């Protein structure tokens, strides 16, 4: 009944809120786990903060949360052009700061998920909004956006291990081998989640559009 459905939804909301303090309490984590992630790194509080977020992501997955998003790269680390990955300026300073923040915690998260048996049922999607140009940006010490060639990677449920798909030209500017679009990437993710992207349609401006616009194909070569 409608009443039962309402009661159930309120009960779910209550359980979600009541479980938050337990899930977010990292004091129950072993010292070895904190060290593995870099969450105890007093010399780099930004890295330690991201590491704690990675641990929290694992804890949410352990509680059955279906979707977890981690964000890296918007920190006050040196002013304009240095506080994120958007490398239009002072790229050498920028990536020297952000690389160490990301590297250890991200690797530790994958290892931890695997050791706990969670990775086989978890799809990890690691990506950005753009690649960077192989040349320096005019009038600046960084590199402009490059929509023609960039890297994303998948790990975990349903994908091949150690497999590379596609490549850019020798200059690093444009994808030329096994070219995949963002729509193909999304179609593949949806497939791994058990969804047929071609059936998720809605009518708009004369087209049956979908989450992959009006095109996109599953990249079968990356599937396990």
Give the ranges of each region predicted by the language model.
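Ligand-binding pockets and gating/stacking loops
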Residues: 1-224
